[in-house]
């Protein structure tokens, strides 16, 4: 059985790097909202995402937080206002 | 024993409402990064936060996602680059 984890990534990066971070993360995870991505990944995918993000960001100026959970069931999601990217449409 | 939940709030709101959302959430939770707040709250605090956010945002244009977890232990946090607001300094 492949072990997976559920990721929630938020980032606050320089405007000159935002597009690169966003287009890269779109290849790995689901865009949820401005600067927020989610998705289920394998351990090796998780490490690859970390390595690739480290290459894109400027460690002195940018901030990326990767929250990881044993599964999506660990979280409840309550949306106020617009649901910019309904996850159930994608999954 | 008071039941608490751990919240992670991300928001994507119109520029004319960002300051109001941010200054309100600063009264309830810890600012973690641009448009990201965290904190442990009681069930009644959780409902108050939802009610107050509903009053501030424009439901047609803005998006707020409230992730809730049974406790902070449900999540692992991995920061790449700058830790804009070291949570351990605040807690």
Swiss-Prot record, chains A, B:
Family: Belongs to the CRISPR-associated endoribonuclease Cas2 protein family.
Pfam families named among the record's database cross-references: CRISPR_Cas2 (PF09827)
GO biological process: defense response to virus; maintenance of CRISPR repeat elements
EC number: 3.1.-.-
CDD domains reported for this sequence: Cas2_I_II_III (cd09725)
Keywords, in A-Z order: Antiviral defense, Endonuclease, Hydrolase, Magnesium, Metal-binding, Nuclease
Name of this chain's protein: CRISPR-associated endoribonuclease Cas2
EC primary class: hydrolase
Names of the cofactor(s): Mg(2+)
Organism encoding this protein: Methanothermobacter thermautotrophicus (strain ATCC 29096 / DSM 1053 / JCM 10044 / NBRC 100330 / Delta H)
Described purpose of this protein according to its UniProt entry: CRISPR (clustered regularly interspaced short palindromic repeat), is an adaptive immune system that provides protection against mobile genetic elements (viruses, transposable elements and conjugative plasmids). CRISPR clusters contain sequences complementary to antecedent mobile elements and target invading nucleic acids. CRISPR clusters are transcribed and processed into CRISPR RNA (crRNA). Involved in the integration of spacer DNA into the CRISPR cassette. Functions as a ssRNA-specific endoribonuclease.
Coiled-coil ranges (or none): none
Domain of life where this protein originates: Archaea
SUPFAM superfamilies assigned: TTP0101/SSO1404-like
InterPro entries linked: CRISPR_associated_Cas2 (IPR021127), Virulence_VapD/CRISPR_Cas2 (IPR019199)
GO MF term list: metal ion binding; RNA endonuclease activity
Keyword DNA repair: no
Record: residues binding Mg(2+): 12
Quaternary state and interactors: Homodimer, forms a heterotetramer with a Cas1 homodimer.
């Amino acid at each position: 059985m492949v072990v997976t984890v559920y990721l929630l990534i938020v980032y606050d990066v320089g405007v000159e790097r935002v597009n690169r971070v966003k287009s890269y993360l779109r290849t790995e995870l689901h865009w949820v909202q401005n600067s927020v991505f989610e998705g289920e990944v394998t351990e090796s995918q998780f490490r690859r995402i970390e390595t690739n993000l480290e290459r894109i960001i400027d460690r002195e100026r940018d901030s990326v937080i990767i929250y990881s959970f044993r599964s999506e069931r660990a979280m409840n999601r309550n949306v106020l206002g617009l649901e910019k990217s309904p996850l159930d449409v994608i999954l």
